[in-house]
Design a protein with these regions (language model features):
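Secretory targeting signals
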Residues: 1-21, 54-119, 136, 169-180
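Terminal transmembrane helical anchor/hairpin motif
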Residues: 1-5, 125, 130-208
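Alpha-helical transmembrane segments
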Residues: 19, 23, 27, 32, ...
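Hydrophobic/aromatic residues in alpha-helical transmembrane segments
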Residues: 22-26, 74, 110-111, 150, ...
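Helix-loop-helix units of permease transmembrane domains in multi-pass membrane transporters
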Residues: 27-61
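Cytoplasmic juxtamembrane interface segments
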Residues: 29-43, 105-133
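Membrane-interfacial segments
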Residues: 31-34, 38, 74, 78-86, ...
Length: 211
């Protein structure tokens, strides 16, 4: 029960903070090319331009995966230090970790495309702020609305659900993650990765222009 409570709160925090953090990460990786106007220089490299999006995406993905792994390890160590009951519920830990990573990869694919397509990085940050809002309140939306906004997958892919018991009492129960949202996130990820590659392949190298 204590572990369930911890992971439920973690899912809520992920929905609020991860979209914004990913927006900043993707923006920083792409903004150096916008400020230095080095898109044309990158276009002279031996590698085709459609791999530029994928290479930057992989760099951000590795940073994101490392961050989520360290976060999970710190939470487990914290729980053991605080005397949480053992054994650790690995049947919850792994689905929550991979569910969070899956939802984050979608957000990263979208933010990477926006950051490369628009030179003004304020636009990318606004998209990240909107995603943070949807990720935080998405659990309150009906299921028909949540599937439209994959940011809401942070709550759906967490394996813990809050159930009201009374006026001021709540219980946390373990559930199976919603497989439909997994497939939906994968579909969005493939769409934006393909879109980003295609956009960079047709890149215009005029000064001040991006993908």
């Amino acid at each position: 029960m204590v572990w369930n409570n911890l992971f439920t709160n973690l899912a809520l925090l992920h929905g609020l903070f991860l979209p914004m953090a990913i927006a900043v990460l993707a923006s920083r990786i792409c903004d150096m090319e916008h400020k230095g106007d080095t898109w044309k220089l990158l276009g002279t490299a031996a590698e085709p331009m459609n791999r530029l999006y994928l290479s930057k995406f992989l760099c951000a993905f590795l940073i994101l995966t490392f961050t989520l792994t360290v976060e999970l390890a710190v939470l487990i160590v914290f729980g053991i230090w605080k005397g949480f009951p053992v054994p650790i519920p690995t049947d919850l830990v792994l689905p929550i970790y991979f569910g969070t990573l899956l939802a984050s990869v979608f957000v990263l694919a979208l933010q990477q495309w926006v950051s490369m397509a628009v030179s003004n990085q304020l636009v990318a940050l606004i998209v990240g702020m909107a995603g943070a809002f949807l990720g935080f309140v998405g659990a309150l939306f009906p299921a028909q609305v949540r599937i439209v906004f994959p940011w809401c997958a942070y709550a759906d892919l967490s394996c813990v659900q809050t159930v009201p018991l009374g006026e001021h009492e709540w219980a946390y129960i373990a559930i199976s993650p919603i497989c439909f949202h997994r497939y939906w996130c994968v579909l969005w990820e493939c769409l934006y990765i393909s879109w980003g590659n295609a956009t960079c392949a047709e890149k215009n190298f005029r000064r001040g222009r991006s993908c």
